[in-house]
Amino acid sequence: CRGLFVCPTASGKSLIIYGLTRWCHSKNLKTLILVPTTSLVEQMSSDFLDYGWLESYIQKVYSGHSKKIEKDVVISTWQSLHKFPKKYFEQFGCVIGDEAHLFKAKSLTSIMTKLHLCKYRFGLTGTLDDLQTHKLVLEGLFGTTNKVISTKELIEKKTLSNLKIDSLI
């Protein structure tokens, strides 16, 4: 089961990641969630707690935190893990990449390659470069692209405020 989900701002990316994580947990799969910054590790962890997840399931991995995995769900920056050997990644049955458009970076591609036994791969992004090569690389890592909803649809459903731009020139 694989997929690359394009989700604009305010479309509920963290809730989607939480839902995928709960599903993987129900299948007894250890889940690795990769985010680009330590502040996003903290934010994602906090969001999970807000959604009702227990802190005892979540392990945050970044500078100053243990990298020995002892919990079912690991939220980490890719910078904290990219030098680890392939064997380290064999424990994960699911990987979820937040801000997946950044996974074209060599370090991130290296991590995804080391997750060769990982059957469940999901990437989420608010933006996707127009370059066909970039899209093909991401689809190779995560699976086919699925547009969840557009910003226009979110505005029409009144989830987002209407956008109005006045030119000053």
Language model: regions and residue ranges:
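Walker A/P-loop
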Residues: 1-22
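Post-Walker A helix-loop "phosphate-sensing" segment adjacent to the P-loop in P-loop NTPases
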Residues: 24-31, 52-56, 119, 146
